[in-house]
Amino acid sequence: MKLLYLQTLGCAMNVRDSEHIVAELKDEYKLTDDISKADLILINTCSVREKPVHKLFSEIGAFNKVRKNGSKIGVCGCTASHLGEEIFNKAPFVDFVLGARNVSKISEAVKTPKFISTDINYDESEFAFGEFRGSPYKAFVNIMIGCDKKCSYCIVPQTRGKEISIPAEIILNEASKAVQNGAKEIFLLGQNVNNYGKFFSSRHEKMDFSDLLVKISEIKGVERIRFTSPHPLHMDDKFLDIFTSNPKICKSMHMPLQSGSTKVLRDMRRGYDKEWFLNRALRLRKMCPEVSISTDIIVAYPTESEDDFKDTMEVLNEVKFEQIFSFKFSPRPLTAAENLPLIDNEIASKRLEILQSRHNEILDEIMKNQVGKIFDVYFEELRANGEVAGRSFSNFLVSVKGSEDLLGKILPVRIEKASRMVLYGKITA
């Protein structure tokens, strides 16, 4: 068989798209880690910030230097969606370009010189994901495609198109097959998962996200359910009740804050304010004390003042997130905020440093407080020094001494030591 080298940048949805690519090519290609031997070299791209876009061109330039004669290079994903032909202009050695909603055309692209497809219109063939899984222990399952939110800073609606919910019967069938193949954890994917069910093609049965969670939890063999990314605006009482009460749903919630300032949130077109976010987050803490909450934060949005930044710090200190993904504002093409005057980079960098430093203090305290507790850990990863790692039900990364026979098992672990990112312990059974 021919050899495929595949590099994936960005979010879990890109990981699932890459799995789809491998499934589409499985009859002709098998994966390799050696790029110099690959017959086909693919990079699946991210465009949420400017840095991954720059990385694309540096990476494919490096690929071109080590590729073997006769091999092909393809660019897929979100950057392919919005740059399109420009990729050929900047890197004429690239053989084809496939947008984020066009990966099902990979077989055609490989066989067609200078093939390009960046259409973001709805096509029901997008629902037919292949069965290849990068991990035998958990299954990423798309429940929706695209986004209709139009946040002022975000390019995703321009790269992934309008929001469409995948019919529940397709999702449930995919989850059932994954469990039959050994997965114990189902990880649901979408830009705004808790808006699921708002936009179906008309002939499909209507179902909201809360009902979908219940249906998946009833599949025999499903032991854990995770999902990303919910939108704070759609965290209604029904959703919170099912999240906290269903024993199959992992008690970790990603709540993308973006800013703690009501003014900046309005400028970002987020649809909620500081008070709404705090109400949802603190209610969740009260309903489910063991929950871990992660978030996204953008500092130095063009309209962010010092007082606005202080509002963000207030939310950080009040919610005490277990994890934050924080970045300086990065202007993206085709967005409402693209041409707004930027805040001085020194000020932006300082705000990011203050935010991350304070969160490190919060995280150190959180991790220290886990010592002595017992967590059920789902082991998925071999680490260095004879260790095996996995995730607790609340999404803490836990590492123990052990061998590969632990992989795929859920076992109780008593936590004995904590670093900022990892808990260390011993299996108690």
From Swiss-Prot:
- Segments forming domain Radical SAM core: 133-365
Primary location: cytoplasm
**Catalyzed chemical reaction(s):** N(6)-dimethylallyladenosine(37) in tRNA + (sulfur carrier)-SH + AH2 + 2 S-adenosyl-L-methionine = 2-methylsulfanyl-N(6)-dimethylallyladenosine(37) in tRNA + (sulfur carrier)-H + 5'-deoxyadenosine + L-methionine + A + S-adenosyl-L-homocysteine + 2 H(+)
Pfam families hit by this protein: Radical_SAM, TRAM, UPF0004
All residue ranges annotated as the TRAM domain in the record: 368-429
Source organism superkingdom: Bacteria
One GO molecular function term of this record is: N6-isopentenyladenosine methylthiotransferase activity
Q: Which cofactor does it need?
A: [4Fe-4S] cluster
Kindly give the InterPro entries that the UniProt entry links to this protein. Answer: Elp3/MiaA/NifB-like_rSAM, Methylthiotransferase, Methylthiotransferase_CS, Methylthiotransferase_N, Methylthiotransferase_N_sf, MiaB_methiolase, rSAM, rSAM_horseshoe
Q: What UniProt keywords apply to this chain's record, in alphabetical order?
A: 4Fe-4S, Cytoplasm, Iron, Iron-sulfur, Metal-binding, S-adenosyl-L-methionine, Transferase, tRNA processing
Record-listed [4Fe-4S] cluster 1 binding positions: C11, C46, C78
Ranges where the MTTase N-terminal domain occurs: 2-115
The top EC class, named as a word, is: transferase
Q: Which residues does [4Fe-4S] cluster 2 bind?
A: C147, C151, C154
Q: Name one GO cellular component term.
A: cytosol
Which EC numbers does the record give? 2.8.4.3
Under the heading PROSITE patterns, the entry gives: MTTASE_N, MTTASE_RADICAL, RADICAL_SAM, TRAM
Query: Where, subcellularly, is it found?
Result: Cytoplasm
Q: How is the cofactor bound?
A: Binds 2 [4Fe-4S] clusters. One cluster is coordinated with 3 cysteines and an exchangeable S-adenosyl-L-methionine.
Q: Which SUPFAM superfamilies match?
A: Radical SAM enzymes
Family indicated by similarity: Belongs to the methylthiotransferase family. MiaB subfamily.
Assembly state and interactors?
Monomer.
What is the role of this chain? Catalyzes the methylthiolation of N6-(dimethylallyl)adenosine (i(6)A), leading to the formation of 2-methylthio-N6-(dimethylallyl)adenosine (ms(2)i(6)A) at position 37 in tRNAs that read codons beginning with uridine.
Instruction: Kindly provide the name given to this protein in its UniProt entry.
Output: tRNA-2-methylthio-N(6)-dimethylallyladenosine synthase
Question: What is the organism of origin for this protein?
Answer: Campylobacter hominis (strain ATCC BAA-381 / DSM 21671 / CCUG 45161 / LMG 19568 / NCTC 13146 / CH001A)
Question: Which gene does this sequence derive from?
Answer: miaB
